[in-house]
Amino acid sequence: MKKSLILGYGITGKSFANYLTKKKLNFEIYDKCFEGKNFIAFPEYKYLKKYENIYISPGFKLKEYLSETEISSLKFQTDLDIFFKHNNSYKIGVTGTNGKSSFAYYLQQILNQVSSGIIVGNFGNPVLDFLHHKKKYSIIELSSFQLEKLNKSLLDLSVITNISPDHLDFHGNFENYKKAKLKICNNRAKTFFANTNMSLKDFAFEIASSLEKIDSNTSRSLNELPHRLEEVIPGIINDSKSTNSASLLYAINKLNFDGNLIICGDPRKEPKSYEVYGPQQVYIFGMHRNELMEKVKSRRSNIKTFSNLDLVLQDIKKADSKPNILFSPGNSSGKDFKNFEDRGNFFKDKVLEYFSD
C-alpha cells in the first residue's frame, strides 16, 4: 500500500492531513511533540525513500535528522507546490521581515472594493484549506521558512516590504535568511520592492493600481490589523507584533517616542546587541529578562527589569497615573506567551485593569 509522510504537525501539517484525508490517501506523520494514531518515529533514510510523497512543514528542520547528501537525494513537497499546481487564481506573493501582514491586509481590502481577493499562507490561512477558492486574487503571505523549502515559485507578482536580520536561530546567519527571502524573486513575475519613503498603505494602492482600475470611488479608509501600533487607550500603544529589533526601533522612530518602553521575549534570534534611543524609561520583563539585558543597550534611558508585566505597570503608575507607554517587545514570545496575539491581548487586559477610568 502506497503511503505519504507528513513532516511536522503544526498549522501546515494539519492542513496536509486534511488534504490527504479528503483525497482518501494513506499517510503517516512525524512530529516530535505528538504521539498517537498515524504518528511514527522519524524513519531511517532507507525507509524515507519508500514513501510516495513526503510533505514538509515550513519550520521543520531537516538538518537535525538527515545529512546534506541525504536531503538532496529526496524530494519534498510543500503546500505551496500543491497550491501553485491546482489553484487558478492570480497569485501575489508578499514577504518581508516586517509589515508583510499589514500590507497584505491593505491590499486585500483595496482589491475587494474593485474585484475579489483572499489572503492565504503565513497570515494564518493555510493555502491547502483554500485550494479551491473562487476569488480572482490570492494574496499569499510568505515567510522565510516557506520560501526556503519552496521548489519552484509560480507567482504572478511578488512584493518585498523590507529585509533585515530575523530568525537567525533557524537560518544560521543573515545571508541564509536573505537568500531564502529573495527566492520570491525566482519566478516569471515582476517583483516590487517597498519604498521606505512611502507608507505601506500607499504602496498597497500602487500595487492594486497596477492590477485593477482604482478611481475616486475606491475608499482610502482601510482597517488596521490588531497588535500593530494599536492604541489601547490614549497614550498607551500595543505593538505586540514587534518580534525583532528592527520593528521595535521602527516603532520608536515612527512615534518619536520618549515615554515608557516595555520589552520582553526570547532574544536568541537577534544577531547582536542594539541601542535604544528616545524612551525616557525602558522596562524589560519576563523569563528572558537576563538574556535581554545583554542585548538591549541605552545610554539615554534608565533600564529596569521585573519578573512580570504587573510589576512593570505598577512601577509606571507610581510615577504617572496617565503615562505614555509603548509595548513593543522586539522579540518572539519565547517562554512568556503562546504567540504575539496572546501577549498583545494580555497587555491590553492589564492596561485596562491599571489605567482605565
Each model region followed by its residue ranges:
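Short internal beta-strands
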Residues: E28-D31, F193-N195, I262-C264, P279-R289
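Walker A (P-loop) phosphate-binding motif
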Residues: D79-N122
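Active-site regions of enzymes building and remodeling cell-envelope glycoconjugates
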Residues: G36-K46, Y51, E70-F76, S89-Y90, ...
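C-terminal helical cap/extension that packs against the catalytic core
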Residues: K269-N324, D357
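Nucleotide phosphate-binding/pyrophosphate-handling subdomain across enzymes
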Residues: K3, S15-Y19, G117, L200-Q281, ...
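Flexible active-site lid/hinge loop adjacent to a nucleotide/diphosphate
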Residues: H133-L200, K335-E341
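Short, basic phosphate-binding NTP loop
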Residues: M1-G93, R228, E294, R300, ...
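Residue-level signal for inorganic ion chemistry
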Residues: L20, I54, V94, N122, ...
